[in-house]
Amino acid sequence: MEKQNIAVILARQNSKGLPLKNLRKMNGISLLGHTINAAISSKCFDRIIVSTDGGLIAEEAKNFGVEVVLRPAELASDTASSISGVIHALETIGSNSGTVTLLQPTSPLRTGAHIREAFSLFDEKIKGSVVSACPMEHHPLKTLLQINNGEYAPMRHLSDLEQPRQQLPQAFRPNGAIYINDTASLIANNCFFIAPTKLYIMSHQDSIDIDTELDLQQAENILNHKES
């Protein structure tokens, strides 16, 4: 098969925290719809695939004019990994070369412009990963890990706990919005983080991840403010 740039959107129908989360609407458009629109407007992809286990999600995806792959129940459970869902989608459509980008519907403030900018960091020759991230709200070196029997140890040095944050190295966390990989490398390594990994930095606001009703309200408020 010729090289293609594939977007895969994993959208389970059932969600324990927020029922039918991926179909919940924000300014009249479902979370799934916001992500599909971002993928389309980015103009980065030859094909956009929604992988789901539910008919309602499949119908919504088709309303936006994208392809649907039905995922078996064992790949759509609470414990199933995202990588297994992406590889299943690639195998189903017969894609094994080019690029694959995971876009999650729970990141509705990620735009087409974000995707284009992240794509510009991807190097086809090096074939590492590009992962979206945002600055850490709390620095990881200022934390303690429980090791055993109520004992705790610092992430690195006890002295880090008393250092001004500005004197510590910058820290970022993946925000779940964008994962870009060479398709063959992702299949071979069975993971999203492949060295060398480049980070595409997004703001805290644009990095909001929808897990609760409050998250949804906050995201809608941010979107309304952007559009006002």
UniProtKB/Swiss-Prot annotation:
Positions of disulphide bridges: none
EC number: 2.7.7.43
Tree of life domain: Bacteria
Alphabetically ordered keywords of this record: Cytoplasm, Nucleotidyltransferase, Transferase
GO molecular function, one term: N-acylneuraminate cytidylyltransferase activity
Catalytic reaction(s) noted: an N-acylneuraminate + CTP = a CMP-N-acyl-beta-neuraminate + diphosphate
One annotated Gene Ontology cellular component of this protein: cytoplasm
Compartment(s): Cytoplasm
Gene3D superfamilies: Spore Coat Polysaccharide Biosynthesis Protein SpsA, Chain A
InterPro entries: CMP-NeuNAc_synthase, Cytidylyl_trans, Nucleotide-diphossugar_trans
Family matches, as Pfam families: CTP_transf_3
Signal peptide coordinates: none
Protein family: Belongs to the CMP-NeuNAc synthase family.
Record-given protein name: N-acylneuraminate cytidylyltransferase
Gene behind the chain: neuA
